[in-house]
């Protein structure tokens, strides 16, 4: 089976998956850990109705869809917040003058506002519709190239809050991929420093950024 269909079993029969990938499922949805997480926490919400699952997210996600799946999005956000609370504490540093880090692991709204993003890829790589709920650290061994990073940190990623698109024309798939995945510079998600096309330098910088803010309990 093509890798494009790797999510199919989680949609059709999540109860048969014999690993810890599935965090929750019911008749409407499966919530799973991304098998190739691009951040410390990276969850996927998969609608189980085949009509939805086979649809393009930019075309099918409307106000009704959002209302139906909002509670699942909130559940995935809660999962990420609990994970960070249980695993990490904020590292206090005289060099860290950014107030957004003060008590971020105690204030869920602050954590979500500054450190979680929810949305879709404008050109999905997988056949089954999925919504990303991901922590904005990009601290992961699975983050391996410019395409991985820019797919979440440019206009290639469409925020849940910006949906539905209401017919907005994004361009062809090729135009979108060229603009955001190939030609767009690498900008640090913490400080906006421009790394041009130097992914290895960005990767080291992201490690330093994460470790300057978080430490294991």
From Swiss-Prot:
Q: Name one GO biological process term.
A: single strand break repair
Kindly list the places in or outside the cell where this protein is found, as annotated in its UniProt entry: Nucleus; Cytoplasm
Q: What Pfam families is this protein classified in?
A: HIT, zf-C2HE
Locate the residues binding Zn(2+). 188, 191, 205, 209
* GO cellular component terms, A-Z: cytoplasm; nucleus
Q: In the Enzyme Commission scheme, what number(s) does this protein have?
A: 3.6.1.71, 3.6.1.72
Q: Cite the domain annotation text.
A: The HIT domain is required for enzymatic activity.
Its function, per the record, reads: DNA-binding protein involved in single-strand DNA break repair, double-strand DNA break repair and base excision repair. Resolves abortive DNA ligation intermediates formed either at base excision sites, or when DNA ligases attempt to repair non-ligatable breaks induced by reactive oxygen species. Catalyzes the release of adenylate groups covalently linked to 5'-phosphate termini, resulting in the production of 5'-phosphate termini that can be efficiently rejoined.
Protein known as: Aprataxin-like protein
| Gene that this sequence comes from | HNT3
